[in-house]
A protein has these predicted regions:
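Hydrophobic beta-strand scaffold residues
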Residues: 32, 53, 122-123, 164, ...
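Interdomain hinge/lid region at the active-site interface
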Residues: 170, 174, 183, 219, ...
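Rossmann-fold dinucleotide-binding core
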Residues: 9, 14, 102-182
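Rossmann-fold NAD(P) dinucleotide-binding segment
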Residues: 57-69, 74-119
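Active-site-proximal catalytic alpha-helix in oxidoreductases
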Residues: 136-137, 141-144, 165, 169-201, ...
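NAD(P)+-binding Rossmann beta1-loop-alpha1 motif at the extreme N-terminus of oxidoreductases
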Residues: 2-70, 100, 131
Length: 295
C-alpha cells in the first residue's frame, strides 16, 4: 500500500509534451521537479517558475514521490530507468513511474519488472492531444498498470488530462497507443489519396473534406489534420516524421509478433517508411501528404 501523499512529481524530459505537463502539474498545486538531458532546459523553466530544476536523473529520482517520463524512445527510457545513476538505483520504494512515452510494450514490461523488484510502481500512460493538450490538460491517456498504482496516481493524472482509459496491465497502454498511431497513419494516407483524386476531378479539396466530415467517410485526418495543420500550410502539430515512423515501425512489430495478416496496415507502414527518401525526419508528420499528394 502507498499511503503517503504524493505531492512531489519529477518530470524527466522537458520537450513539447513534458514542459506542458509540468505546467499543468504546477497549476494543480503539485511541487514539480524537472530534468532534461539538454543543458539549460530545466533551468529556463525554473526561471519561469514552472518547476525546480534538477541536474541529473539521480537527483530527481531521489526527491520525487512520482516520476513522469516524457521521452522519445524505449531505448532512452531504458537508459534513464535502468542505466547507471538512473531511476532504478535512486528512486525510493513506493515511488511510481508514469511513462508517457509511446514505447515498445515488451521493453515497457521489462522496465516495470525491474522496478517492481525494488518496490517501485510503474504505469504506462501514453498520451494523445499534442503539445496544446499537454499545456491545457485536455489530453487523453491510455493506462496500463495495476488498479492500485493507477488509483494512487489518479489525482495527478486528473490535473494533466481530461480523459483516462485503463486498458489493462503494464504494457497494455503502450500497445493501445501504437495501434492508435498506426490508425492515425492509415487515416492520413487514405485522406491524402482522396484529396489528390478530388483535385484531379476538379473538386475543391477543402469542400471535399467539409463534405466528408458530414458523412461516414470522416476520420481523424479529415476532422483534425487537414483543417488544423495542412490546408493552412502551418504543419506545426509538434509531432515529427521521425516519431511517427518510429511508432508505425513499432506497430508493425506488433503485427508480426501476433502473425496478423493486416494488408492495409502493412501497406501503410511501407509508405511511411518509403517517405524517408523525400520527407526529412525533422518535418511535421503531416508532411506525409507531400509524398502521397505532391500537388
Amino acid at each position: 500500500m502507498r499511503s503517503r501523499r504524493m505531492k512531489t512529481v519529477g518530470v524527466i524530459g522537458l520537450g513539447n509534451m513534458g514542459r506542458g505537463m509540468a505546467g499543468s502539474l504546477r497549476r494543480g498545486g503539485y511541487t514539480v521537479l524537472g530534468y532534461d538531458a539538454a543543458p539549460g532546459v530545466a533551468l529556463a523553466l525554473a526561471g519561469q517558475a514552472v518547476l525546480s530544476a534538477r541536474d541529473s536523473v539521480a537527483t530527481i529520482a531521489r526527491d520525487a514521490d512520482v516520476l513522469l517520463l516524457s521521452l522519445p524512445t524505449s531505448a532512452v527510457v531504458e537508459a534513464v530507468v535502468l542505466g547507471a545513476g538512473g531511476v532504478l538505483e535512486n528512486a525510493r520504494p513506493g515511488c511510481i513511474v508514469i511513462d508517457t512515452t509511446t514505447a515498445d510494450p515488451d521493453s515497457t514490461r521489462r522496465v516495470a519488472a525491474a522496478l517492481a523488484e525494488r518496490g517501485i510502481g510503474f504505469v504506462d500512460g501514453p498520451v494523445s492531444g499534442g503539445p496544446k493538450g499537454a499545456a491545457t490538460a485536455t489530453m487523453t491517456m491510455v493506462l496500463g498498470g495495476s488498479d492500485s498504482d493507477i488509483a494512487a496516481i489518479e489525482p495527478i493524472l486528473a490535473v494533466i488530462s481530461a480523459k483516462r482509459v485503463h486498458v489493462g496491465p503494464v504494457g497494455a497502454g503502450h500497445t493501445t497507443k501504437l495501434l492508435n498511431n498506426l490508425l492515425t497513419g492509415v487515416h492520413l494516407l487514405a485522406a491524402s489519396e482522396a484529396v489528390r483524386t478530388a483535385r484531379a476531378a476538379g473538386v475543391d479539396p477543402e469542400k471535399l473534406v467539409e463534405a466528408l466530415n458530414g458523412g461516414s467517410g470522416r476520420n481523424s485526418a479529415t476532422l483534425t489534420n487537414y483543417p488544423t495543420w495542412i490546408f493552412n500550410g502551418k504543419f506545426d502539430s509538434g509531432f515529427t516524421m521521425k516519431l511517427m515512423r518510429k511508432d508505425v515501425r513499432l506497430a508493425l512489430g506488433l503485427l508480426d509478433q501476433f502473425d496478423s495478416v493486416a494488408p492495409v496496415a502493412r501497406e501503410a507502414a511501407r509508405v511511411w517508411a518509403a517517405s524517408e527518401v523525400s520527407v526529412a525526419d525533422g518535418e511535421d508528420f503531416n508532411r506525409i501528404v507531400d509524398f502521397v499528394d505532391p500537388a
